[in-house]
Amino acid sequence: MRITTVNPYSQEKLGEYEEYDDNRLNGILSGLKEAQREWEKDIDRRIDYFRSVLKPNLSKRRNELAKLITEEMGKPITQSLSEIDKCIKLVDYAINDYPHYLEPQTIKTEGKKTYVRFDPLGTVLLIMPWNFPLWQVMRGAVPAMLAGNAIVLKHASIVTGTSLMIEEIFSSELFRSVIVSGSRVGKLIQKVEGVSLTGSSGAGKSVAQEAGKHLKKVVLELGGSDPFIVLKSANVHEASENAVFARMQNNGQSCIASKRFIVHEDIFEEFADEIAGKFANVKVGDPLDKSTFLGPLSSMDQTKTVRSQIENLSGMGKVSSFGQYSGGIVPPTIAQISGKFEEEVFGPVAILTRFRTDQEAIALANDTPFGLGASIWGHSDEAERIVPEIEAGMVFVNKIVTSDPRVPFGGVKQSGIGRELSKFGTREFTNIKTVWIDH
């Protein structure tokens, strides 16, 4: 099977790649397992690798990789560069902070010595999406490799070139990218010790089912339909300013993008007017132009899906689009509705609805199968009081939801299982081993 990558803005063909056959895959997996046996023995070696190999390689190839990311999946070039810079910061955390999370933890008991150690599992399969093609990989690979695991990456086919460049940047016998179709992922799952998937809820269920057959450890970071709650006490100007990036970052294709804007009725019109004015002034166009804020969606299939969702929203309320459809570009769009819309819209579409009471806002926020992130805007004490009632893995007050190496990332409900980053993510792909020495 041949895989072809296409520029979603120009529709030009970028490259063609051959799928790896079973012999090549088996050779790669055997090499990873052999290398991992030595890798797990020395954390100082692992830290030195991040410091002397991975970080310099990311910096050296920053511009080249950013351009390829933008060409393959349409992200504005300024955001591609920012994504790489964020990955470099993650490596710094892996060098300076994450090793402490892997130190044995002493527990006081009646025995002579009792402690918990964190041993690697072996080889971890990363099944990654196209929307943040470097950050998603780094978020999974760096903590797992620091813990002593090897990594095999199965990336989304539309970013195959990026996947191979990432392998070059890692430049390690502990990290390999493979080109395989989705139908063959099951065979890979059988041959590794852990699986981390970022993708849709449907993909997560399929991978969890396959992993369950073989009792493989899984971490699933899945879809989201994050609420952006604007309380009566909110600074409307601040909230609307942040709403633009919260909804349209990465051309609206982010699992943690704010998608449902739940606004107090007393300030609803003011907020709606402000966000409409800002949406109307967004620079749309060539993602390689540094002044562009909104580029094309990742593929024509994705464009068709979002356009269909906008048509469905038109039957539920007032829909306003600010610009023209052109190729893969979907213009900034606002839908004011009174009912609920359960689908995750992976494009620059803001769904606005109003509420009267805090309990109504909470009910609207939770009325979704997803539970990834949520942001609340208003007086911090008032906002914090409703945090426990929000069904989400992450709640940010007066800040848009983001992934940060210092805090755990992940969701509940249909948004996933497990956590990435921080102490919790670093330990996900470890054998948490109890050691009790009685005398």
Which residues does each PLM region occupy?
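Residues at or immediately preceding the N-termini of alpha-helices
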Residues: 8, 22-25, 43-44, 62, ...
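N-terminal Rossmann-like NAD(P)+-binding subdomain of aldehyde/semialdehyde dehydrogenases
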Residues: 1-112
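Short, well-ordered beta-strand elements within core beta-sheets of diverse protein domains
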Residues: 15-20, 34-40, 126, 228-230, ...
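Structural signal for hydrophobic packing residues in well-ordered secondary-structure cores
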Residues: 36-40, 58-62, 66, 73, ...
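Rossmann-like NAD(P) dinucleotide-binding subdomain of oxidoreductase/dehydrogenase enzymes
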Residues: 107-238, 355
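ALDH superfamily catalytic-core signature
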Residues: 1, 14, 194, 202-337, ...
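Conserved C-terminal structural/oligomerization subdomain of aldehyde/semialdehyde dehydrogenase
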Residues: 10-16, 326-439
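Residue-level signal for inorganic ion chemistry
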Residues: 11, 46, 69, 91, ...
